[in-house]
Design a protein with these regions (language model features):
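Ser/Thr-centric signal marking residues that sit
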Residues: 32, 317-318
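Class I S-adenosyl-L-methionine
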Residues: 1-307
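Conserved SAM-binding loop of SAM-dependent methyltransferases across substrates and taxa
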Residues: 319-325
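Class I SAM-dependent methyltransferase "Motif I" SAM/SAH-binding loop
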Residues: 312-316
Length: 325
């Protein structure tokens, strides 16, 4: 469900119920040279203006909520100082860096990036910022190609041949930067899916296991415990329990592999313009952010069916292109 309210951002924030929003994304205007905004472009006016909005934004966020602030070098320093004061440096999550088109008219340094500052309302309750590797731009195509190749070999030549091809492909891919983790995913299951065998021992006191319901009996290890009986039964009924040398392991699938969100992103600003063109909205906004960027931030931080707010979308950006994702 999407709703757009046409009103001044500050008035909108005052009407929002406290602690009702999971995620806020904003691309605040600056250096507008326009009379349409409620501040002039002097530093003091802008700082007071952004501070008023961020104070109300913090109040609107749930305890587990996060805010993302798109900004460039023009106002990066001022906005970060203000955000640190309002949210606290302890709740600063990090800075995403997005690439921009190369500019040839710079007098000194060619600036080819912008920033997205990220803060939690309360870092102790913030999401883990984990994301499926198949959704990360750096991994998506290589991993999907690998899974497709192995599935095809499995269908045509069987599990043993798929296993051999997988080892060859992993040897090559794992030499690339960021792909070393693939060395673990060296097995193919009875459906042609890639997985690795995850150890089910835990750093706890040794114990034996006797679960008659699934006919599972394990001797205690010398210095480690076993996963809980509930965990072992769950894996059994999900057909994710396998054994090597009479020891149980979990099938951990490549398609479910996660990683922390990466901070340097390959979402170019010009893609936002193309996204609007696809919607028949060419020229509607001067600097729209790409759908991929907004989607990435939401996937990192926002559970399904959450309420998301952008209280500057009419002024700059992406109610049309971003939140369809």
């Amino acid at each position: 469900l999407h709703k757009v309210f046409i009103m001044e951002a500050l008035e909108c924030l005052k009407r929002i119920e406290k602690e009702s929003i999971q995620t806020i994304y904003i691309d605040p205007p600056y250096n507008t040279k326009s009379s349409n905004f409620e501040y002039e472009d002097a530093h003091a006016d802008y700082e007071k203006w952004i501070e008023e909005h961020l104070i109300l934004a913090k109040a609107a966020l749930k305890q587990s909520g996060c805010i993302f602030i798109s900004i460039d070098d023009n106002k990066m320093a001022e906005v970060k100082i203000i955000a640190n004061e309002i949210f606290g440096t302890r709740n600063f999550l990090g800075t995403f860096i997005t690439k921009q088109a190369t500019r040839s008219n710079a007098k000194h340094i060619n600036i080819t990036h912008e920033y997205v500052l990220s803060y939690a309302k309360n870092k102790a309750f913030a999401p883990g910022f984990k994301i499926l590797r198949t959704l990360l731009p750096i991994y998506a195509k290589p991993l999907k190609d690998l899974m497709r190749t192995i599935k095809n070999v499995f269908k045509q030549k069987g599990q043993a041949q798929a296993q051999l091809i997988l080892k060859e492909q992993i040897k090559e891919l794992s030499q690339k930067e960021h792909f070393n983790f693939l060395k673990n995913y060296n097995l193919v299951d009875e459906k042609g899916e890639i997985y690795f065998a995850k150890d089910l021992s835990t750093p706890s006191h040794p114990r034996s296991v006797a679960i008659q319901e699934i006919n599972l009996f394990l001797e205690p290890l010398k210095s480690r415990g076993w996963s809980s009986d509930e965990k072992l039964k769950e894996l059994h009924y999900q057909n994710r329990l396998i054994f090597k040398n009479n020891r149980p392991y979990e099938k951990y699938y490549l398609k479910e592999s996660q990683d922390n969100c990466l901070s340097v992103l390959d979402f170019y600003s010009r893609q936002g313009t193309k996204d609007l063109e696809k919607l028949g909205l060419k020229g509607l906004f001067k600097t729209p952010k790409p759908v991929g960027l907004i989607k990435y931030l939401l996937l990192c931080s926002t559970p399904k069916n959450s309420i998301i707010l952008d209280f500057f979308c009419r002024q700059r950006d992406n109610s049309a292109s971003g939140y369809r994702s």
